[in-house]
Amino acid sequence: MTVHNLYLFDRNGVCLHYSEWHRKKQAGIPKEEEYKLMYGMLFSIRSFVSKMSPLDMKDGFLSFQTSRYKLHYYETPTGIKVVMNTDLGVGPIRDVLHHIYSALYVEFVVKNPLCPLGQTVQSELFRSRLDSYVRSLPFFSARAG
């Protein structure tokens, strides 16, 4: 099992942070364009799920998968979206995404007066702690197999 990448978006679609670990294929477009496409897809899926679900879904959608990867999604009450792409063998990781938001983003970005909110995260401490945390996950593989 492995982690491919992670996105953090604000409620306006600004990509606050992007990290990559075992991404085998690049999108072939500029990163800014990739971020816009990812956010647009998330917005559309979220809207579709809320309209089509026969039940009142308090959490909306949590993940979806293709034949190649699984996208895990977590949205906070403030509209921050945490998105992690993994291989298909990874089960539900809502608690992992919540931890990334609450214990890393809030602690090292939101509570840091030197980190302006609504802009790309510049904190090296956040980046290094995020990288260490993701690498410590049981489904993170040192080899992209």
Swiss-Prot record:
InterPro entries: Longin-like_dom_sf, TRAPPC. The keyword Endoplasmic reticulum applies. Pfam families: Sybindin. GO terms for biological process: COPII vesicle coating; endoplasmic reticulum to Golgi vesicle-mediated transport; vesicle coating; vesicle tethering. Disulfide bonds: none annotated. GO terms for cellular component: cytoplasm; endoplasmic reticulum; TRAPP complex; TRAPPII protein complex; TRAPPIII protein complex. SMART domains: Sybindin. It is found in: Golgi apparatus, cis-Golgi network; Endoplasmic reticulum. Its main location: Golgi. SUPFAM superfamilies: SNARE-like. PANTHER family: TRAFFICKING PROTEIN PARTICLE COMPLEX SUBUNIT, TRAFFICKING PROTEIN PARTICLE COMPLEX SUBUNIT 1. Belongs to the TRAPP small subunits family. BET5 subfamily. Part of the multisubunit transport protein particle (TRAPP) complex. The heterodimer TRAPPC6B-TRAPPC3 interacts with TRAPPC1 likely providing a core for TRAPP complex formation. This is Trafficking protein particle complex subunit 1. It comes from Mus musculus. The lineage of its organism: Eukaryota, Metazoa, Chordata, Craniata, Vertebrata. The gene is Trappc1.
